[in-house]
Regions:
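Short, surface-exposed alpha-helical recognition segments that flank or form part
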Residues: 10, 14-17, 173-176
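Active-site anion-handling motifs in enzyme catalytic cores
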Residues: 18-20, 67
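Generic N-terminal amphipathic, Lys/Arg-enriched alpha-helix
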Residues: 1-13
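Active-site anion/phosphate-binding pocket segments in diverse small-molecule metabolic enzymes
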Residues: 10-13, 105-110, 203-207
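Flexible glycine/acidic-rich beta-alpha junction loops that bind and position SAM and/or redox cofactors
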Residues: 2, 133, 197-207
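A short, N-terminal amphipathic alpha-helix
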Residues: 22-32
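Active-site-proximal beta-alpha core segment in soluble small-molecule metabolic enzymes
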Residues: 35-198
Length: 207
């Protein structure tokens, strides 16, 4: 039992019992579904436990150059990077620290994708399946006019060099929300699914 009165303040306290319980859930989902689980740092960026997280996952995501560097240097694996914006100032660091990069649009891929492909990085495209259970428009990536992913009518064909598709429409969501999201993806993007090597279904899964 932790005596919280004896802890220095401020400090971060990690309950290893609860962590082990969560990791057991992740292990079961990986085993029974066959899916790879990629940890989002915004859920837990305590780098001192990265070795333990790495043993129970298939990598970690990054949404910025700084996060990509943290994954690369402390998680011990290149990052699966998806960022809202890529710029000439941050792209070199992102390329150095990533082995998967997802782009928001075809134009963004056309600008930075060739640089990633030259380094052997697997490139993906974020899609907008026009479904999300998120009720607050500010946080809903599928609202009309969203720049977070391409809709089916904006994608005439899968660009050469795109290995995967990525949708991120959930937030602390349950399995039935993922089912509905997958149905929307199949409806709007099903013709591309047999042409890709991976499908990133995160994040936002409450596990």
């Amino acid at each position: 039992m932790i005596d919280f009165l004896k802890l220095p303040s401020p400090c971060y306290v990690l309950d290893e019992t609860l962590l082990d319980r969560n990791l057991a859930v992740i292990d079961r989902v990986r085993r029974e579904s066959g899916a790879e689980i990629i940890v989002a740092l915004k859920a837990c960026a305590m780098w001192s436990i990265f070795p333990e997280l790495a043993r129970h996952s298939d990598g970690a995501t990054a949404s910025s150059a700084a996060e990509a560097r943290l994954v690369f240097e402390e998680y011990g694996k290149p990052a699966h990077t998806y960022a809202p914006v890529y710029t000439d100032r941050n792209i070199d660091e992102i390329l150095r620290c990533s082995d998967h990069i997802t782009f928001n649009s075809v134009a963004q891929f056309e600008r930075f994708g060739p640089m990633a492909l030259l380094r052997g990085i697997s490139c993906g495209l974020r899609i907008n399946p026009q479904y999300s259970p998120v009720e607050t428009d500010l946080y809903n990536p599928c609202v009309p006019g969203s720049r977070l992913g391409v809709t089916a009518d904006e994608l005439n064909d899968l660009p050469a060099g795109i290995d995967g598709l990525h949708f991120h429409v959930l937030c602390e969501s349950r399995p039935h929300h993922l089912k509905l999201a997958l149905e929307a993806v199949e409806k709007h993007f099903g013709q591309y699914l047999d042409r890709i090597g991976w499908l990133n279904m995160g994040g936002g899964h409450l596990m």
